[in-house]
From Swiss-Prot:
May be involved in transcriptional regulation. The keyword Repeat applies. Belongs to the krueppel C2H2-type zinc-finger protein family. This is Zinc finger protein 69. SMART domains: KRAB, ZnF_C2H2.
């Protein structure tokens, strides 16, 4: 039998004597990747990595399964086979001989070397792991590559039974310590948080590798920001942040990305694929990050706290953005208008205001949006679902942020204070709008006359006055392509176009009546709810629509400061 049941040595199948090998640590020959890091590598980098590791497997005399019956070069070079399938074939051969449920000798949590060593007397068994994956073993050679690669490196070993059994069928493991990380792949648990930036990780080894970036101890140092990396490939990938290189292009829309993982997530916006589904409410998401962020809404968990004011957040990037309000750091500056922004997403959205680009298009009504947040908020208007209800007055809202804002009406809370004049506001958007009175910023520009405004509301009001002028002049520049009818404003044209298609995308869940526009749908909903949000300031009478309130206003004798010159 083999001289050791812990992969420290192997017995030559051609002799009856065991041959003791020189000590070899996996740390000395392996490159460590986390699952996140592996996702960032491009195809050529992964290929190089596989070739190096294949050569390493070939050279390590510790492997219990003989390779002489395989032509490794042929197996790898054959395009119909890949490295994963080759390893999984070996895994399945070994699994056939395993007997789940038996006990095993646990390997101590130290470096695995391949010299003869007495087995630890500690005997343990495991029946708690629920994952559906194969464990990689207990060593730094555990490259955390199970997600994208699936290389079950330690499964080449033949010694001993595999008693650690996954509760999902046909999955066996040699070492109990290797369970901890794969289990978190399924639960989404990331218990190791970086004290510097708040980023979380599945395993202790992953966070150790990450900390190198902050400590500056890695051999590959970024010349732009000083971050250090333990791996050349990760250093090269990081450089793209500074150089702006985006080698991964979407075939459908032409948009480019710095990372292949980001491209894959983006492609789901075209396909509509949302593989990450919430078990509590059934809502699905494009990316695991959005899914984990959503989960915290149910749990109420806010694990990331601002060191200055103690405010807590559901994810680390929100903390980083919030902390810039204390430091007033705004690293992203617009080259067109000079405005500086604190977050990259805000900066990208701002640039689209200049370019007019609206990459997020609603599949139901065709409306385009500058940001993903605006698009997601709009999507909910079609469903009519209002899951967020006020406990005090019973009013329901589509978005949790709208409910929070509404609740401040009851409490009188105004948490957003202007640092220049001390005035407080219920929402950050109102504070932002107020801030422009101090800075003089006017980001909303009329496409027809060039006049700029502080808010979108003011721009829309201005556009309505232009429409009013056209009513007198008779100008109708917006023509329907089907019937040639002209309109004063683009919104009127869009509403008209739906009369040709007969399309009625907004359906009332209570009575089944359908509407061609969201405004008509919202007005109709109020007939069921009895809601009358438009209130006359003079007599207190309330109305379902703003237009009805305006008509009512004419019944009161009052000043009319806006006079038509024509």
């Amino acid at each position: 039998m083999p001289c050791c049941s812990h992969r420290r040595c192997r017995e030559d199948p051609g002799t009856s004597e065991s041959q003791e090998m020189d000590p070899v640590a996996f740390d000395d020959v392996a490159v460590n990747f986390t699952q996140e890091e592996w996702a960032l590598l491009d195809i050529s980098q992964r290929k190089l990595y596989k070739e190096v590791m294949l050569e390493t497997f070939r050279n390590l005399t510790s492997v219990g399964k003989s390779w002489k019956d395989q032509n490794i070069e042929y197996e790898y070079q054959n395009p119909r086979r890949n490295f994963r399938s080759l390893i999984e074939k070996k895994v399945n051969e070994i699994k056939d001989d395993s007997h789940c449920g038996e006990t095993f000798t646990q390997v101590p949590d130290d470096r695995l070397n391949f010299q003869e060593k007495k087995a630890s007397p500690e005997i343990k068994s495991c029946d708690s792991f629920v994952c559906g994956e194969v464990g990689l073993g207990n060593s730094s050679f555990n490259m955390n590559i199970r997600g994208d690669i699936g290389h079950k490196a330690y499964e080449y070993q033949e010694y001993g039974p595999k008693p650690c059994k996954c509760q999902q069928p046909k999955k066996a493991f040699r070492y109990h310590p290797s369970f901890r990380t794969p289990q978190r792949d399924h639960t989404g648990e990331k218990p190791y948080a970086c004290k510097e930036c708040g980023k979380t990780f599945i395993s202790h080894s992953s966070i150790q590798r990450h900390v190198v970036m902050h400590s500056g101890d890695g051999p590959y140092k970024c010349k732009f920001c000083g971050k250090a990396f333990h791996c050349l490939s990760l250093y090269l990938i990081h450089e793209r942040i500074h150089t702006g290189e985006k080698p991964y292009e979407c075939k459908q829309c032409g948009k480019s990305f710095s990372y292949s993982a980001t491209l894959r997530i983006h492609e789901r916006t075209h396909t509509g694929e949302k593989p990450y589904e919430c078990q509590q409410c059934g809502k699905a998401f494009h990316s695991p990050r959005c899914y984990r962020r959503h989960e915290r809404i149910h749990t109420g968990e806010k694990a990331y706290q601002c060191k200055e004011c103690g405010k807590a957040f559901t994810c680390p990037q929100y903390v980083r953005i919030h902390e810039r309000t204390h430091s007033r750091k705004k690293p992203y500056e617009c080259t067109q208008c000079g405005k500086a922004l604190s977050s990259l997403t805000s900066f990208q959205t701002h640039i689209r205001m200049h370019s007019g680009e609206r990459p997020y298009e609603c599949k139901i009504c065709g409306k385009g949006f500058c940001s993903a947040n605006s698009f997601q908020r709009h999507e909910k208007t079609h469903s009519g679902e209002k899951p967020y209800k006020c406990k005090q007055c019973g009013k329901a809202f589509i978005h949790s942020s709208s409910l929070r804002y509404h609740e401040r009406i009851h409490t009188g809370e105004k948490p957003y204070e202007c640092k220049q004049c001390g005035k407080a506001f219920r929402s950050s958007s109102h504070l932002q709008l107020h801030g422009r009175t101090h800075t003089g910023e006017k980001p909303y520009e009329c496409q027809e006359c060039g006049k700029a405004f502080r808010s979108m509301k003011n721009l829309q009001s201005h556009e309505r006055t232009q429409t009013h002028v056209r009513i007198h002049s008779g100008e109708r520049p917006y023509k329907c392509k089907l019937c040639g009818k002209g309109f004063y404003c683009p919104k009127s044209l869009q509403r008209h176009e739906k009369t040709h298609t007969g399309e009625k995308l907004y359906e009332c869940k209570q009575c089944g009546e359908a509407f061609s526009s969201s405004s008509s749908f919202r007005y109709h909903e109020r007939t069921h709810t009895g809601e009358k949000p438009y209130k006359c300031k003079q007599c207190g009478k309330a109305f379902r629509a703003a237009s009805v309130l305006r008509m009512h206003g004419r019944t009161h004798p009052e000043d009319k400061p806006y006079e038509c010159k024509q």
